[in-house]
């Protein structure tokens, strides 16, 4: 049958079906809407039967025609097949004209005809496509689709046609082939899919063709491919023998039907690049180079970058010689980064052209500053997480063409999250609604919901975080939440385009901050640093001789006003907190006592005329705060002699505790916890002798406990010993001996170790201090002799007990050797004894003389053998100790002899020079014993009267101008074995009984009570030695160390360097650097 006959036959069939359709529509109008839907089904069945009859007739008539090709050709679909027979133009034209005429006729009744046209015109459309007449095809489709849409035709002109309904027809169902995941060799996914296609083609016409339908290898999936098939056995048959699929032959997983559409879903990731943001190159000679975005072409998927060029000048130079040129080309060498130098290129023979603001060389554009501007594909750059280093920025340019620093920080990677909070005022900085202001209502990840402040916009709007920026106005009170000034608060005084100027509440400085680092707040900054260790206005120590006050807190540094009036910037780790000086006293220009929190006026110096409150006193310097001063937050420093107490006053409580009306300037002497006050008052017969000192009118403290040495019995500082600096009814401030740290402790956790007040106050064992100047040692009360009231031992006529030895033993020896009123020999406590829980005090007893006498006798005279003394050479012996320890050692200050004992008398100014007689250095032994016997004259020496009413005092009384430096090496309790710990190296002292072991070094293996199991290296054996016979080995530089005392006890680290008696240790736990005394460190055994 010819094509014309086919077309005529189809037309007749169409007319018949159209007439049937009209009759069916008349019937439909009579029925209800539900009934009409059911009626369409039999109609469709009749049409299908007619089509089948038509197909069978066509097959019978066309038996001689070659068989048709299958419509679904596997992997490749032919777009157009050319028929073997020649097609006549007139036949196509007739058919086309009939179609066009028919469409014009049926335009009025298109609702009834379009469905039938679609079904009947399928074959005719194939014939239309065979001829390439574009004009008539275009006219045909214009007329067909310009008047009405498919939705209007099918659904009666409804505009509510949803895309979801149309898409449901394309979704896979249970009757469709399934997708199976097959594990593949990574990187070979595409090649494996192609090899499966070739295998499918090869087996297509065999007895066992492959039963799979398709193979999918998505670009973003690594290590897997998807195979479409009805059964898993079909997949196994297809992948058998494919080398890249060996891993997945035994296990294939079926993709759920709901997830099958996601496999082929293409999500194009669009990089949101802005000009002046930073990227890096992925490949080529510019791999990993930093570049700046010049502009982006999203339509062409390209990006223009500004970068530092890499030009091979050697290659240009080698062009002169072809031989060298070919030799150079064999060895590829990545040229270094260097700015474009036009003069050098020309000197090497290169051709440089000019094009406006750019130079052209080898097809590349260079700026006049030497940067390369080149376009790359978007896939050739890395856009996420790009952070230019400081060196790269310096090489790129100091300030690259007005670069916006805010853009740099924004493009430093996705790890920087926004800091928007509900309640923030924001404005839109990008898009169509730019400059629209609003208030944040909610934050959901990167989506910010705001309520716009606009009269025409009443609904909430949602924006991405990058399109918003914080908005502030003048007068807002804000807090800095990030950056250098984090934690500071202040008032906004000026708002500029990219930053905000605010006036700090704390330091009264102007701060320049980015808007994104601010947040509205109502509270004021606490003035405490991030670590909570320091606060604004705190007195800190910069070095052993310099202190200062923190006037500005920053994230990593402090600004400190030192005692000389200079503001220095230091790191947090470089300062240490100064101990509390609230009770320090100084003298102003009119000899008034001034204290902390007093209001004073400055009458001299650079700050003359100012008035302020004293915050800190240190030596002769006072740190003052003035609310009228803006600089340094109102803090300034001046000398105390430049001050005068506001309103003036007489010396406070001076007559109660000073001699002759003298007001001491030293804060330590005037301190109520000092033993001199109690001793002096007791010595003068006041009823409060030894009661704890004077009071300055600040009666909130418990004076009974202040100054005592106590041991902490509970808590984290259990076992530590210190001196009570201040006390109330419930708590006490204790300065620890081991760490020089002052802490607050509950009084119920304290036990008194000893009393340091001379003046008759009894302690636990009836001893006042211990040795030295104690009145009673054993027994209780105030029994001056040793046993009861027996001054002579046997009868009442013998004043000296044995011979001329009045103070033979410790009991009746008020001082050690010289008189009780000898101002030249205060005889401080000599040493601690293990049978009494008494550690040496926090402060040594002051000397009654400034120059000439004993300026500071050592508090512990002899170091106890059980104490780990690292530097014993710094322990001068206490005067007067020879008689106490039955030795023949001498002291040039207190060793009177019968031949010529010298007893100094204080001059009116008490600035005399001690000059002992030459004979005073000889020790004459008593017939009764081998004890040095002091001359009787020593106990009868009377000092000359002083014009200022000065008289000799109890040892330890204050003296004008006397000073009390701390004794070196007295920071560790002598009878303590707390330093003993495992794994440290020790040395056996000469006090150990076994002489073969003495002097050997070893390592402590274990500690039980006071006994240590020590492995001796030399003798290669383990011995048990008491801790009192051991001493730790001092570590040296780069040694592994272990902290043996203090709050960091048991911590390990590496000793990096040594500065005097201190060592800088890098701790193993937190990698922090700490400065510790070498006596607190033990040397670990090297691995």
UniProtKB/Swiss-Prot annotation:
Composition-biased stretches, type Acidic residues, lie in: 1-27, 38-64, 78-92, 834-844
Keyword Zinc (UniProt): no
KOW domain boundaries: 273-306, 420-451, 472-503, 594-627, 704-737
Residues bearing PTM Asymmetric dimethylarginine = 681, 696, 698
Q: Where is this cross-link: Glycyl lysine isopeptide (Lys-Gly) (interchain with G-Cter in SUMO2)?
A: 143, 1037
Q: Where is this region: Interaction with RNA polymerase II?
A: 313-420
- Reported impact of residue 247 to A: Reduces the affinity for Pol II elongation complex
Where are the N6-acetyllysine modifications? Answer: 718
Which GO molecular function annotations are given, in alphabetical order?
chromatin binding; enzyme binding; mRNA binding; protein heterodimerization activity; RNA binding
Reported effect of changing residue 775 to A? Decreased ability to promote transcription elongation
Q: Which residues bind RNA?
A: 579
UniProt region (Interaction with SUPT4H1), positions on chain: 176-270
Q: What is the effect of changing residue 791 to A?
A: Decreased ability to promote transcription elongation
Compositionally biased spans, kind Pro residues: 857-866
* Sequence ranges of Low complexity compositional bias: 896-911
Variant or mutagenesis effect after changing residue 578 to E: Reduces the affinity for Pol II elongation complex
Query: Spans of the CTR repeats?
Result: 754-759, 760-765, 766-771, 772-778, 781-787, 788-794, 796-802, 803-809, 811-817, 844-851, 854-862, 863-869, 881-885, 896-902, 904-911, 916-921, 924-930, 932-939, 943-950
Tissue note: Ubiquitously expressed.
What's the reported outcome of changing residue 251 to A? Reduces the affinity for Pol II elongation complex
- The region called Disordered is annotated at 1-92, 670-700, 747-978
Outcome after substituting residue 806 to A: Decreased ability to promote transcription elongation
State the InterPro entries in the record: KOW, KOW_Spt5_1, KOW_Spt5_2, KOW_Spt5_3, KOW_Spt5_4, KOW_Spt5_5, KOW_Spt5_6, NGN-domain
What this chain does, per the entry, is described as: Component of the DRB sensitivity-inducing factor complex (DSIF complex), which regulates mRNA processing and transcription elongation by RNA polymerase II. DSIF positively regulates mRNA capping by stimulating the mRNA guanylyltransferase activity of RNGTT/CAP1A. DSIF also acts cooperatively with the negative elongation factor complex (NELF complex) to enhance transcriptional pausing at sites proximal to the promoter. Transcriptional pausing may facilitate the assembly of an elongation competent RNA polymerase II complex.
Q: How does it assemble?
A: Interacts with SUPT4H1 to form DSIF. DSIF interacts with the positive transcription elongation factor b complex (P-TEFb complex), which is composed of CDK9 and cyclin-T (CCNT1 or CCNT2). DSIF interacts with RNA polymerase II (Pol II); forms DNA and RNA clamps that stabilize Pol II elongation complex while maintaining the nontemplate DNA strand in the transcription bubble and nascent RNA in the exit channel. This interaction is reduced by phosphorylation of the C-terminal domain (CTD) of POLR2A by P-TEFb.
**Protein name as annotated:** Transcription elongation factor SPT5
**What species does this protein belong to?**
Homo sapiens
Species lineage, top-down? Answer: Eukaryota, Metazoa, Chordata, Craniata, Vertebrata
User: What gene is this protein translated from?
Assistant: SUPT5H
């Amino acid at each position: 049958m010819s094509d014309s006959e086919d077309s005529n036959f189809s037309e007749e069939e169409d007319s018949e079906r159209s007439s049937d359709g009209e009759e069916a529509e008349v019937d439909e109008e009579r029925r209800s809407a539900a009934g009409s839907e059911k009626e369409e089904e039999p109609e469709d069945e009749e049409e299908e039967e007619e089509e089948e009859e038509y197909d069978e007739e066509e097959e019978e008539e066309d038996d001689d025609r070659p068989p048709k090709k299958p419509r679904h050709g596997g992997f490749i679909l032919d777009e157009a097949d050319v028929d073997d027979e020649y097609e006549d133009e007139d036949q196509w034209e007739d058919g086309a004209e009939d179609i066009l005429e028919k469409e014009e006729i049926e335009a009025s009744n298109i609702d009834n005809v379009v469905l039938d046209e679609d079904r009947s015109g399928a074959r005719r459309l194939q014939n239309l496509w065979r001829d390439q007449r574009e004009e008539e095809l275009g006219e045909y489709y214009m007329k067909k689709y310009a008047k009405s849409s498919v939705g209007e035709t099918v659904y009666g002109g409804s505009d509510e046609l949803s895309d979801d309904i149309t898409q449901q027809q394309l979704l896979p169902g249970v009757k469709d082939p399934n997708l199976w995941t097959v594990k593949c060799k990574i990187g070979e996914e595409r090649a494996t899919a192609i090899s499966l296609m070739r295998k499918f083609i090869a087996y297509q016409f065999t007895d066992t063709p492959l039963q799979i339908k398709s193979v999918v290898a998505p670009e973003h999936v690594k290590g897997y491919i998807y195979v479409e098939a009805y059964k898993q056995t079909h997949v196994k048959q297809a992948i058998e023998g494919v080398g890249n699929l060996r891993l997945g032959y035994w296990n294939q997983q079926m993709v759920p039907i709901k997830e099958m559409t996601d496999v082929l879903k293409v999500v194009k990731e669009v990089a949101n690049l802005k000009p002046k943001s930073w990227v890096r190159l992925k490949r080529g000679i510019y791999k990993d180079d930093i570049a700046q975005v010049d502009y982006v072409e999203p339509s062409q998927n390209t990006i223009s970058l500004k970068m530092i060029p890499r030009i091979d000048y050697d290659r240009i130079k080698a062009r002169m010689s072809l031989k060298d040129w070919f030799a150079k080309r064999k060895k590829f060498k990545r040229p270094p980064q260097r700015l474009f130098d036009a003069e050098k290129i020309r000197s090497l023979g290169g051709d440089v052209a000019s094009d406006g603001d750019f130079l052209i060389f080898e097809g590349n554009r260079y700026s006049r500053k030497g940067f390369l501007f080149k376009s790359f594909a978007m896939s050739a750059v890395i856009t996420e997480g790009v952070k230019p280093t400081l060196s790269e920025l310096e090489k790129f340019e100091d300030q690259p063409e007005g670069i916006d620093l805010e853009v740099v920080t924004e493009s430093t990677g996705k790890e920087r999250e926004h800091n928007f909070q509900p309640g923030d005022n924001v404005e839109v900085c990008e898009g169509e609604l730019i400059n629209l202001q609003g208030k944040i209502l909610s934050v959901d990840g990167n989506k910010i919901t705001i309520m716009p402040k606009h009269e025409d916009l009443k609904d909430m709007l949602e924006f991405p975080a990058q399109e918003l920026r914080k908005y502030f106005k003048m007068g807002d009170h804000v807090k800095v939440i990030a950056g250098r000034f984090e934690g500071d608060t202040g008032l906004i005084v000026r708002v500029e385009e990219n930053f905000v100027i605010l006036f700090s509440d704390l330091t009264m400085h102007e701060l320049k901050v980015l808007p994104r680092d601010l947040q509205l707040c109502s509270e004021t900054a606490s003035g405490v640093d991030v670590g909570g260790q320091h606060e604004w206005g705190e007195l800190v120590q910069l070095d052993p001789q310099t202190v200062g006050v923190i006037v500005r807190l920053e994230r990593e540094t402090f600004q400190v006003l030192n005692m000389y009036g200079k503001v220095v910037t230091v790191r947090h780790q470089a300062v240490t907190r100064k101990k509390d000086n609230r009770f320090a006293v100084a003298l102003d220009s009119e000899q008034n006592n001034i204290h902390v929190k007093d209001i004073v006026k400055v009458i001299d110096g650079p700050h003359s005329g100012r008035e302020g409150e004293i915050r800190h006193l240190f030596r002769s310097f006072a740190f003052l705060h003035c609310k009228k001063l803006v600089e340094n937050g109102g803090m300034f420093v001046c000398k105390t002699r430049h001050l005068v107490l506001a309103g003036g006053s007489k010396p406070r409580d001076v007559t109660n505790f000073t001699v002759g009306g003298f007001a001491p300037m030293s804060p330590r002497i005037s301190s109520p916890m000092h033993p001199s006050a109690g001793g002096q008052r007791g010595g003068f017969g006041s009823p409060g002798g030894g009661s704890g000192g004077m009071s300055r009118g600040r009666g909130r403290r418990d004076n009974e406990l202040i100054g005592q040495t106590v041991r902490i019995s509970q808590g984290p500082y259990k076992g530590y010993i210190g001196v009570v600096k201040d006390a109330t009814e419930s708590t006490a401030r204790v300065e620890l001996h081991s760490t020089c740290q002052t802490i607050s402790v509950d009084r119920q956790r304290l036990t008194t170790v000893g009393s340091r007040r001379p003046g008759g106050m009894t302690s636990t064992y009836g001893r006042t201090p211990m040795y030295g100047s104690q009145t009673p040692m054993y027994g209780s009360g105030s029994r001056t002799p040793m046993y009861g009231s027996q001054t002579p031992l046997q009868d009442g006529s013998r004043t000296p007990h044995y011979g001329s030895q009045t103070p033979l033993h410790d009991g009746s020896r008020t001082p050690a050797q010289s008189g009780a009123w000898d101002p030249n020999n205060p005889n401080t406590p000599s040493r601690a004894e293990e049978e009494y829980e008494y550690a040496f005090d926090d402060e040594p007893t002051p000397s009654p003389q400034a120059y000439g006498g004993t300026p500071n006798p050592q508090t512990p005279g002899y170091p106890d053998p059980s104490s780990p003394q690292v530097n014993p050479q710094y322990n001068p012996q206490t005067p007067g100790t020879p008689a106490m320890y039955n030795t023949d050692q001498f002291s040039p200050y207190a060793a009177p002899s019968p031949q010529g004992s010298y007893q100094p008398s204080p001059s009116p100014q008490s600035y005399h020079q001690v000059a002992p007689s030459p004979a005073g250095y000889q020790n004459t032994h008593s017939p009764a014993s081998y004890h040095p016997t002091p001359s009787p004259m020593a106990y009868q020496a009377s000092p000359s009267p002083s014009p200022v009413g000065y008289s000799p005092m109890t040892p330890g009384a204050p003296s004008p101008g006397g000073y009390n430096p701390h004794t070196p090496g007295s920071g560790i309790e002598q009878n303590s074995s707390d330093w003993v710990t495992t794994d440290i190296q020790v040395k056996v002292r000469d006090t150990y009984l076994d002489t073969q072991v003495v002097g050997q070094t070893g390592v402590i293996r274990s500690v039980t009570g006071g006994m240590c199991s020590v492995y001796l290296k030399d003798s290669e054996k383990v011995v048990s030695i008491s801790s009192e016979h051991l001493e730790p080995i001092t570590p040296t530089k780069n040694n592994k160390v272990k902290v043996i005392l203090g709050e960091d006890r048991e911590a390990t680290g590496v000793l990096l360097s040594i500065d005097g008696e201190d060592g800088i240790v890098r701790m193993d736990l937190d990698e922090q650097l700490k400065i510790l005394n070498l006596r607190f460190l033990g040397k670990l055994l090297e691995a």
